[in-house]
């Protein structure tokens, strides 16, 4: 199979530009559902006391870069958990989890790659296919990080993405530390923008599969090494 085409951070620049006028319909509905279920918002004052050690459905963190992309997206979700290693920056959190990806997730990716190659979509490889000898501090925007391209990174949030002819996906790993620094809530948000009917068709099986994969990856952030 062909190797994934290289991407640069610039290729996603339009996705990271806030819309001129946000339309809060889907996100408002999602926020309302979260409040009704009693889920703590990632940036709430009681986050560190209320957050569980199992993933909970939440919202894109207020003020995060990924929040700019939620409105108008075809699909988005967010999952939060109290981090087992609160001192790790967001990219290090992602790398730790990716390097220990469960076999069933990599197996699902191999199946996905075989099937989508029949309709001309990219082989992304496996989620665990990250450079084991490369530290988070060595990555620069535009570098490949497993199946994603690194778009931006900071002490509070890392954005990873990929683009193909059918859709664009951006994943955020956001860390909110307590004042003392001994606790942190990590929120993983996924935003998908589809380009055409193929993207919508692709999302039919991917949407439910993503639910299980996202929860498993976020759960790993809450589990110790």
How should these model regions be labeled?
Residues 3-5, 12-22:
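Residue-level detector of structural "landmarks"
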Residues 8-14, 26, 31-37:
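Low-acidity, Ser/Thr- and Arg-rich intrinsically disordered low-complexity segments
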Residues 48-131:
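Hydrophobic ligand-binding cavity/cleft-lining segments
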Residues 52, 128-132, 140-143, 148-151, ...:
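Mature, function-bearing regions of proteins
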Residues 137-180:
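Hydrophobic-ligand binding "helix-grip"
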Residues 165-204:
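Beta-strand/loop substructures that line and gate deep hydrophobic ligand-binding cavities in soluble
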Residues 202-225:
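A conserved amphipathic terminal alpha-helix motif
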């Amino acid at each position: 199979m062909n190797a994934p085409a290289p991407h640069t951070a610039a290729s996603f620049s339009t996705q990271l530009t806030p819309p001129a006028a946000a339309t809060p319909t889907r996100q408002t509905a999602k926020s309302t559902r979260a409040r009704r279920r009693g889920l703590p918002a990632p940036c709430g004052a009681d986050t560190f006391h209320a957050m569980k050690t199992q993933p909970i459905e939440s919202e894109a963190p207020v003020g995060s870069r990924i929040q700019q992309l939620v409105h108008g997206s075809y699909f988005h979700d967010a999952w939060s958990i109290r981090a087992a290693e609160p001192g790790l920056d967001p990219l290090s959190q992602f790398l730790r989890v990716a390097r220990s990806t469960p076999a069933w997730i990599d197996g699902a990716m191999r199946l996905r790659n075989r099937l989508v190659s029949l309709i001309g979509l990219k082989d992304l490889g496996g989620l665990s296919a990250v450079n084991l000898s490369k530290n988070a501090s060595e990555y620069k925007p535009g570098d490949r990080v497993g199946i994603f391209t690194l778009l931006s990174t900071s002490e509070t949030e890392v954005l990873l993405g990929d683009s193909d002819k059918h859709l664009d996906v951006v994943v955020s790993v956001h860390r909110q530390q307590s004042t003392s620094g001994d606790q942190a809530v990590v929120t993983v948000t996924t935003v998908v923008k589809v380009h055409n009917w193929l993207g919508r068709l692709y999302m039919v099986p991917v949407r439910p599969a993503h639910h299980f994969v996202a929860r498993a990856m976020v759960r790993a952030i809450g589990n110790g090494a």
